[in-house]
A protein has these predicted regions:
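Short glycine/threonine-rich beta-strand-turn micro-motifs
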Residues: 27, 31-34, 38, 48-49, ...
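Non-catalytic extracellular/periplasmic "stalk"
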Residues: 99-100, 109-186, 220-259, 297
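Helical hairpin unit composed of two closely spaced alpha helices linked by a short loop
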Residues: 359-384, 392-393, 411
């Protein structure tokens, strides 16, 4: 949990109970503070408080989803960071409203419950699956939108001209024109364009989060060594792809690893074998300039969940035994926990090209199909100031908590952030990665 609560202390012989002032907020690196102020218009304390508020709301939403399934209609932070809980008409609405107000949250009356939206989501999936290929090719993705209380179906601009019309029974679906994005990195790979595929599966699940916390590896809050390798630092995969390190951690056998993006590995089929892709420091290894190697890809996944596990060579393992992320050459940010994505929550991403850039989450549990190369399912979308090729695999945080790994963006050809504009970044939730690899852990305080 980010932040602290006041502690009640009784001094020997004292007649009064005194409240100790709250501890100061964790110190944030200057590069991150600048990004928070520039991109979010928040102070560091406001950013940390809003991130914590979001995680508290996630846990409350999980309990509401289980206790009041007939009326619960989603939860989010509004533009001012106010926690909102949607409620639809149902036999349990009065009790649900009492629970929301008792928790100090605001209620928004909505027309459809989350359960009804999930049912419509399944019908939409079936409808897309049965479309002829010349029409399904214009569908780019879909997700439940708790704020608008509907389903956002994203298509390309040519969809309506090709006769793509929603049937009457899909009454909760809102069509949005525009591509869902393309691969934002690696820098030496040609940009990947999106193609179509059903944006949802036949078996729909509630957009809930795992209430039991995944295991973490605890480390002491000590500053990193001068030669330490941190999340956000650049690396090269066999000289073919330049990416960013993600979160440091350990695997099921206790080996030191770094968790990055799966599509950064150009030979993913060889992961975990003697022919596995070698990871090199920096982004200049091209076969002629040999920067030092630091590990090999032990596991690579690009289908549905985009992640890689880079097993660190024993000779340099000590350099990765830390829980920090940063922009290359900058001061470190300690990772203190693991978080869930929530619409409206503040996020900041670190990458070796764009550095720290911040924004808010606009979608959760979204599916994105990128050519024949990879598919993202249950990804979250953050609208951030800038994302550049080379940022893939880098860490996405909310507050000081690990949230996800950068996977794709909709500005793959942007060269720099000099004329930065807000862009969408798709990220794979860190909890989805840990669930897909038993025993994998993220280092935290």
């Amino acid at each position: 949990m980010i932040g602290t609560t006041a502690l009640l202390l009784i001094a020997p012989g004292a007649a009064l109970t005194l409240a100790q002032p709250p501890a100061p907020a964790p110190a944030l690196p200057a590069d991150l503070v600048a990004a928070i102020q520039r991109d979010l218009g928040l102070s560091p304390a406001q950013y940390l408080d809003r991130a914590e508020t979001g995680q508290n709301l996630v846990r409350f939403a999980d309990s509401m989803r289980a206790t009041f399934p007939e009326s619960f209609a989603g939860a989010w932070l509004d533009a001012d960071g106010t926690p909102m809980v949607g409620l639809a008409d149902g036999i349990d609405k009065a009790a649900a409203r009492t629970a929301v107000e008792a928790a100090g949250y605001q209620v928004r009356d909505q027309q459809h419950s989350e359960r009804a939206l999930l049912d419509q989501f399944g019908q939409l999936s079936d409808w897309i699956r049965n479309l002829p290929s010349e029409l399904s090719g214009h569908v780019k993705g879909a997700s439940i939108d708790p704020v608008h209380n509907d389903i956002a179906l994203k298509t390309d601009a040519a969809a309506q001209g090709q006769g793509l019309q929603l049937p009457d029974f899909l009454g909760f679906v809102r069509v949005i024109l525009g591509s869902l994005g393309s691969a934002q990195q690696p820098t030496t790979q040609p940009p990947v364009t999106t193609t179509t595929a059903p944006p949802v599966t036949t078996t729909t699940t509630s957009p809930t989060t795992t209430t039991t916390e995944p295991p973490v590896t605890t480390t002491a809050p000590q500053p990193p060594a001068h030669d330490a390798m941190l999340g956000g630092d650049p690396y090269s995969a066999d000289g073919l792809n330049a990416c960013s390190l993600g979160f440091n951690g350990t695997d099921h056998s206790g080996n030191v690893v770094n968790i990055s993006a799966g599509h950064c590995d150009p030979n993913g089929q060889n992961a975990g074998t003697p022919d596995a892709t070698v990871a090199y420091e920096g982004n200049s290894h091209d076969g002629s300039v040999h920067t030092p190697r630091f590990g090999t890809f032990d596991k690579t996944v690009t289908d549905n969940v985009d992640f890689s596990v880079i097993k660190i060579d024993k000779e340099v393992a000590g350099r990765f035994k830390n829980n920090f992320v940063r922009v290359p050459g900058g001061d470190p940010l300690p990772i203190t926990g693991i978080a869930d994505p929530l619409v409206g929550a503040p996020v900041c991403k670190s990458g070796e090209k764009a550095g720290f850039n911040c924004g808010t989450i606009s979608d959760v549990n979204q599916t994105l199909v990128i050519d024949d190369y990879r598919t993202l399912k249950d990804s979250f979308v953050a609208t951030v100031a800038c994302a550049l090729p080379g940022d893939s695999g880098g860490p996405v945080v909310t507050g000081t908590m690990a949230l996800g790994i950068s996977s794709a963006g909709d500005s793959p050809t942007q060269a720099d952030c000099d004329n930065w504009h807000y862009t969408n970044v798709w990220a794979t939730p860190i909890k989805a990665i840990l669930a897909a690899d038993a025993g994998l852990k993220v280092r935290t305080n």
